[in-house]
């Protein structure tokens, strides 16, 4: 969303609205501060005058971890200075079918390259553990979309990824292994299904695999109304998730 419903506001308006959200959340009964996130996936593109970079498909072609970390660090600074806390990036998708309309979101079809560049991106956004982790100018990062979004049958978006668990992890899970090692704070669930079951309602993958086996200790966040993709669910109600 844009400050006060208008796209042409400058950074001071973003900061003003962020402060208003924060104060409103702190004045509630529980006093839990709000976390405001944005899809700054190749620059803080909702902010007028922000620097924009190529999408991941272009950045992946460089195979340059230092460059990716530097770019993410620049984006983090602009998100931070606008008063926001979180970016829904990086995507660590592994596109395996060029028919998929979101192949541009992935660094590569090579899981090892996705893992290395995803790790570099997270460290650019959040900083490095023991050095500058979430210090001034850094923001929370999100590894997405867990898991198998780039491996659906015939490249259908929000489709069905039919793989064994070993192949799912070996091909589509390596970006999460590497970003969890860098203490990524958020992981976003995917719209797709795995062997016929939607990810947003899949406890085994989101809890048993991601948290208990992979060791993710952060926040699992849904994609845009992703819970309504689960059978029997709606945007306003989904007990299955």
Tell what function each PLM region has.
Residues 1-241:
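Glycoside hydrolase catalytic-domain context in secreted enzymes
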């Amino acid at each position: 969303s844009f400050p006060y419903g208008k796209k042409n506001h400058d950074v001071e308006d973003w900061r003003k609205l962020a402060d208003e959200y924060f104060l409103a959340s702190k004045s509630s009964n529980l006093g839990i501060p709000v976390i405001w996130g944005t899809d700054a996936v190749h620059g803080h593109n909702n902010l007028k005058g922000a620097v924009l970079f190529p999408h991941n498909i272009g950045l992946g072609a460089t195979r340059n971890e230092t460059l990716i970390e530097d770019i993410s660090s620049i984006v983090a600074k602009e998100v931070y200075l606008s008063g926001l806390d979180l970016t829904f990036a990086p995507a660590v998708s592994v596109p395996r079918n060029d028919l998929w309309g979101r192949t541009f979101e992935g660094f590569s079809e090579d899981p090892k390259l996705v893992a290395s560049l995803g790790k570099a991106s997270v460290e650019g956004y959040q900083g490095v553990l023991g050095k500058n982790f979430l210090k001034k100018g850094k923001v929370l990062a999100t590894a997405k979309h867990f898991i198998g979004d780039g491996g659906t049958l015939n490249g259908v978006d929000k489709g069905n990824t039919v793989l064994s668990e070993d192949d799912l992890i070996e091909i589509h899970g390596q970006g999460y292994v590497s970003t969890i090692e860098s203490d990524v704070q958020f992981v976003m669930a995917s719209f797709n299904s795995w062997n016929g079951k939607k990810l947003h309602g899949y406890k085994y993958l989101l809890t048993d695999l991601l948290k208990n086996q992979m060791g993710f200790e952060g926040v699992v966040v849904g994609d845009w109304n992703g819970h309504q993709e689960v059978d029997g669910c709606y945007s306003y109600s989904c007990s299955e998730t």
